[in-house]
Amino acid sequence: MKEIKDLKKNLKYVFVSYHDPDYYFGLNVIHKAFPEAKIISTAQTAYLIEASKDMKLDVWKKQLGTDAPDTLIVPEVVDTLPAIEGNALEIKYDKNDSAHPFVWIPSLKAIVGGGSVTEGVHIWMADTQGDNDIAKWQQVISTMKQLEPATVVPAHFVSSDYTPKVLDFVEKYLADYRQAAAKSNNADELTAAMEKAWPQLPGKDNL
C-alpha cells in the first residue's frame, strides 16, 4: 500500500484471485486505505469466500490475535477486468475448475498465477483433498503453459525471478504429490514421502 501511495497511483480495483484466508483477511485494511477502490473477484471465488469465511476466521482468530480482521469483505462479482494503462487483463481458468482463476496480460505475455502457483517452497495441499482435485490443478498449470508466458508471478514464494520455470516446479511437485498420496496409507507417510522427494525445500510445515 505504501508503494502505491508513494507512486501516487489511483487504485481503482483490487482483484481477489482465490478463496483462502490469506487472500481476503487483509481486505479491510486495504479498504480503509483506499475506500474508493472496488474489491472484485469471479463469482466462484466470491461464493467460496462467503461460504467459508466465518469458519475460517474461527480457525485462525486465536493464532492471529490482534491481527485478526475485524471485518470480512466478500468481493463484488465481475466477469471481466478493466484494462490498466492500456493493457488488457483477462480472467482465465480451466473450464472444469472455475475455483482457480488466474490473470493473463496478453501485451506483456504475463500470468499472475493466483493460488495455483507457488515457487521454491512446499505447496499448501491441505485444501486439495482428492486425486481429482489434484488432477484439476494440474490441468490449470497445463492451461497456463499453453499460453507460453514470458513472465509468471507466483502467489507464494521464497524468492522468484518471475520466469515460466515456476510452472515446471508446480507441475513436478503436483505429480510427485499425487504419486505419493496414492501410495501412502496416512498423512504421516505422505509427509515423509514428500520430504524425501524434496529434501532441500523449505516450508515443511505446509505438508
Where are these regions (language model features)?
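Active-site-proximal loop/helix segments of hydrolase catalytic cores
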Residues: 88-147
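Compact alpha-helical subdomains of small soluble proteins
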Residues: 37, 186-207
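Divalent metal-coordination and catalytic microenvironments
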Residues: 4, 18, 39, 103, ...
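Active-site metal-binding motif and surrounding structural segment of the metallo-beta-lactamase
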Residues: 1-40
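Divalent-metal (often Zn2+) His-rich catalytic cores of metallo-beta-lactamase-fold enzymes
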Residues: 104, 110, 135-193
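Active-site environment of divalent metal-dependent phosphoester hydrolases
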Residues: 19-24, 46-49, 98-99, 118-122, ...
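Active-site neighborhood of phospho(di)ester-bond hydrolases with catalytic His/Asp-centered motifs
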Residues: 12-20, 40-43, 111-114, 147-158
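Metallo-beta-lactamase
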Residues: 47-99, 106-107, 148
